[in-house]
Amino acid sequence: MIDLIDVSKIYPVKGSDDVVALDHVNLHVKAGSIHGIVGQSGAGKSTLIRCLTALEKPTFGSIIVDDIDLSQLRGRELRQARRKIGMVFQAANLFDAKTAGENIEFPLKVAAKKEFTREERKERVRELLALVGLEHRGGAYPSELSGGQRQRVGIARALSDTPQVLLCDEPTSALDPESTRAILSLLRQVRDETGVTIVIITHEMSVVREICDSVTLLKNGGIVQSGTIEEVLADPGSPLAKELVPAPSVDELDVADFNRELTDREIAAQSSSAEPKTSAQASEDGNILLDVIFTSHPGVPTGSNMLNLAAKLGADVTAGTFESMGSVQVGRLALAIPAAQRSSIIDQLRAQGAHVEVRSL
């Protein structure tokens, strides 16, 4: 459905180095999927979405939507191709002087004026209001709607001309948690009922966990990692996998305590009935804290099996999280283990397919 082939976008700067906003980006988004694009500010997300909507032309490369290279189109052909792409903004960007229904109808009156009669437009508006759960609010003005309701109107407006692709630019970042969950559920419903391909630009990994089938991580204009959720989680030590399943919270003082070497005073206190220990020997009496990530793909233990293994190895589970994303169950544990058994325990955990790191402050 969507293919970016070696796409670069470079902005020349007079008297300074050029700004490379996108750097040889290659990406495939499957038809009918929900794909997340994540990254910090300056990663290239905004430039990418402007290129996808053909508001910006890439300096190099091709952007293909439904087998049409947008970067090669001009004039009327480009305007027609853009109609295949609907856009949902961070703020709904509704016309304040128009009702919800009139906002939804507006694209049909402008871009498709000759293709629909007035009655056909009104019927389309009724269908879309029902789809987004606002069938009784079509006559309300934006000022009379909540933030979540305004975003629903924005989604309906983006769908008015029956696009094949729906681009969502930070669609939930201005919403409260309850409205965020409702909008994400609506987007999934829209995909399921219409078959539209959805691309979500976001900095919130919770959005990816909740709704996406696949995800791409951008950094400095390039792709760091990309794949389906299952592919990403199959490599639990990868940057995206670590972001998708955050490390369970452990008090920093506990982390420091688990990783510290015993002080000379503690060494002396332990030496009443034995020869004083050296610092190196004493450090072997302490604990260290491990960060363990595992998934339930074939050949890897489930969460309960991993907990049983941790207990068998003498590890103390100080915190843990378990998530189900797509067809994969993924878990992340903070394990306190005896420093003297570090190598043996880490080897046994890794032998079971877990990704293991020593946590530090």
Each model region followed by its residue ranges:
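Conserved ABC ATPase "signature" region
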Residues: 68-69, 105, 109-112, 118-136
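Conserved signature/switch motifs of ABC ATPase nucleotide-binding domains
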Residues: 140-143, 160-161
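A short, surface-exposed alpha-helical micro-motif characterized by mixed small hydrophobic
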Residues: 208-210
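ABC ATPase "signature
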Residues: 226-227, 235
